[in-house]
Amino acid sequence: MATVLRIDPETLPRTLALDPPVTDAEFEEMCRGNRMGIRLERTKDGVVRMNLPTGGWTSSANAVITGQIGNWQVAHERGRAFASCVAFCLPDGSILSPDASYVSEERLKTLPKGGLRGFPRVCPDFVIELVSESDPLQKVKDKMNDWIANGAQLAWLIDPYQRQVLVFRPGRDAELISGDCIAGEGPVNGLVLDLARIWQCYED
């Protein structure tokens, strides 16, 4: 009779430092073998971060965000929008997953044929991260700065608990915005994100 190993994700460490660090190929294989719904990322220093599955509020809000960006991308017929299940191999050696993202046609053309089949070796032009209750705010802010440092032109950190958005841009301080909508610029000029629909996801 087979032995069933039961692992409580809550008891797992949040970071895993391996020596030597896992290679890109090993990390991708690790992600494919993950059966617990844990989202894995690798920092530029080779540390593997484990992010637990989200609750219903955050999952619902993610769906609303991804849907709006996807609809905008289809209407404008340019670039590609991505959901939270993708991981990008970034120039500094890290492999990170945003909650939602957009890659312009120009950057997509830098990928080799089949470059989207695995983890794309490109930094998104635009990323969104959604604060969850388990996220230390400074940790998420640091991740936003990592996106910008790797080439993102615009990054939104959405905090549904404070009902506000921190906007990150290259070479500028983060800008705090509150309200029921936020307008895109640069690579996502014309995008208007309905924040009110996101706030509603956090109401039972």
Report residues per predicted region.
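Gly/Pro/Ser/Thr-rich low-complexity, intrinsically disordered segments predominantly at protein N-termini
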Residues: 1-204
